[in-house]
Amino acid sequence: PEKEDRIPKTLNWDLFTGPAKMNPYNEIYHPWNWRGWWDYGTGALGDMACHILHQPFRALKLLYPTKVEGSSTLLLNACAPQAQHVKLTFPARENMPKVAMPEVEVHWYDGGMMPDRPKGFPEGKQLMQSGGGLTIFHGTKDTLICGCYGQNPWLLSGRVPNAPKVCRRVPKAMNGGHEMDWVRACKESPSSRVMPKSDFSEAGPMNEMVAMGVLAIRLQGLNKTLEWDGANMRFTNIGDDETLRTVIKDGFKIHNGHPSFDKTWTDPVNAKAFAEEPVSYTHLTLP
């Protein structure tokens, strides 16, 4: 934003900013759109993928991807794009009873970008389910469709499986039960604690997967599939001398019916250092 707005009396801008870069206050940041600016959030991926991608992460026993690539509408240096697509490739995992776990691709779309309609999807039926999101599992024998947050799952064939209930269910999960399950676990003795459904041992790696998608979008200017070493938390195919530029301002104009393009770019930065910074948390210094 090019202008500075008056800070509302009800807002402590310094406290809100915390360890992030101190920017002049602008009403576009708060209370909702802060998540779209890189100084404060991670765009639609950080906002919704932590909910929608939890189903494949848990069901398919995913951990670290080995490859990732991203593409989007115009990417600016200060904020997330309007629409984006990320592809994450995960290695084969240990097979489960009656279910093989080969290498698998996970695709994320947002901002109006959509996956292809699965073969056999009912004509006239909207692909997007209620809640503004869906997950499609493409299997060798059937296709599973889940609504936003994994709700209302159904098989494309119409078959109703006799699915065993193998996971503990949280009562009233969508109405405060999920949060109280976490509070309950915090209060229990470690010796007898029933782990919450939102345990950090699962939530941490799952959110690393989401953040990897954000990095893929921000590194798309390298024009390559990025290879990831999860154990050592680093990309293995970004060279020491590779550089990256991002658009600061899109100077697109139409004059007398003719378009003109006059983008303002950042200076080139070292791509390897740029990729390492979000992983190392160098922006946050603790005493």
Predicted feature descriptions by range:
Residues L45-M48, L53, F57-L60, Y64-L284:
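Glycine-enriched catalytic-core subsegment of oxygenase/oxidase enzymes
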Residues P1-Y64, E202, M206:
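Mid-domain beta-loop-alpha active-site segment that forms a flexible
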Residues F16, T282-P287:
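Conserved small/polar residues in nucleotide/adenosyl-binding loops
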